[in-house]
């Protein structure tokens, strides 16, 4: 007996095939989805700053910054021979890093000012300033001889480019201090 299809079943089959073809064409016509793992260049970036110095000590800290922001990293540490007493008559007394007892300690300051380009490269300006006592010296103040800290200090500004992929960038300053920075989105 031959297989017969009713008109109604044939019509439904035709509608179903037409609908399936329409949906298939619509699926192929949709725009592709672009997946990217990059974040906007002005988004927060984690910067880790590590200072290695025989004179000013070692320190490390991580902070989050946006492109165009600046941040100051400041570390105070006890020098190898201990803090050096300072009195108000010492030259530059107001700018000396002092502990709670009024004795000079080591201080390292790093100001980081990154600007991230569209390609993800950070153009960084780094300002470095450090002070440390290296013993004492005798000075005359108000007609009296007083012992003051013999201050070693270094100030330097460097500019450089670095990736924001977490790869470290090391900068060597004129006094031998090394600063290693990494930036990660």
Annotate each language-model stretch with its function.
Residues 1-2, 22:
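A general, composition-driven signal for non-globular sequence regions
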Residues 2-3, 29-185:
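Outer membrane pore-forming secretion/assembly proteins and partners of Gram-negative envelopes
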Residues 2-15:
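Bacterial N-terminal signal peptides that target proteins for export
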Residues 13-24:
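Bacterial N-terminal signal peptides
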